[in-house]
Amino acid sequence: MAKSKPKDNALAQNRKARHDYNILETYEAGIALTGTEIKSVRASRINLKDGFAQVKNGEVWLMNVHISLYDQGNIFNHDPLRNRKLLLHKKEIKHLSEETQKKGITIVPLKVYIKNGFAKVLIGIAQGKHVYDKRETIKRRDQEREIRRTLKNYG
């Protein structure tokens, strides 16, 4: 029996980031969460749309990522928009810091998932696209789709 593809276990994805940015490199980082935050993340109640990461004092912080309040959290609930620390190796942090010093480069979260019981976030070093670049991408995607469609019908 053929092996099946491993399913994508993403709890949240930032699809808009791949449209708005050219992703140059990606890193897998752990994320420091409180008890009610991890319960909300496991329930897929997280929004990465406006999120970004910054390097401050040798640490990487994830900002503007909304993790909804946990329903049974009562007084122990967390602040939905608090800054969260990303867990990376020093070498990776140094590289991220050097890259973000360049003009037009930022760090964006691409995906949040659970791996071996721990929450992980896939972050990408990204460079902003211009409007004409976005149109080129859409045009190229449509052409490839049209080619696949004709090959399927006549091939």
UniProtKB/Swiss-Prot annotation:
Annotated Gene Ontology cellular component terms: cytosol
Alphabetized UniProt keyword annotations: Cytoplasm, RNA-binding
Keyword Ion transport attributed: no
Alphabetical list of InterPro entries matching this protein: SmpB (IPR023620), SsrA-bd_prot (IPR000037), SsrA-bd_prot_CS (IPR020081)
Disulfides per UniProt: none
Alphabetical GO biological process terms: trans-translation
Broad class of where this protein is predominantly found: cytoplasm
Subcellular localization(s) per the UniProt record: Cytoplasm
SUPFAM superfamilies noted in UniProt: Small protein B (SmpB) (SSF74982)
Gene Ontology molecular function, alphabetical: RNA binding
Coiled-coil spans in chain: none
UniProt record similarity statement: Belongs to the SmpB family.
Function comment: Required for rescue of stalled ribosomes mediated by trans-translation. Binds to transfer-messenger RNA (tmRNA), required for stable association of tmRNA with ribosomes. tmRNA and SmpB together mimic tRNA shape, replacing the anticodon stem-loop with SmpB. tmRNA is encoded by the ssrA gene; the 2 termini fold to resemble tRNA(Ala) and it encodes a 'tag peptide', a short internal open reading frame. During trans-translation Ala-aminoacylated tmRNA acts like a tRNA, entering the A-site of stalled ribosomes, displacing the stalled mRNA.
UniProt-recorded name of the protein: SsrA-binding protein
Organism whose genome encodes this protein: Ligilactobacillus salivarius (strain UCC118)
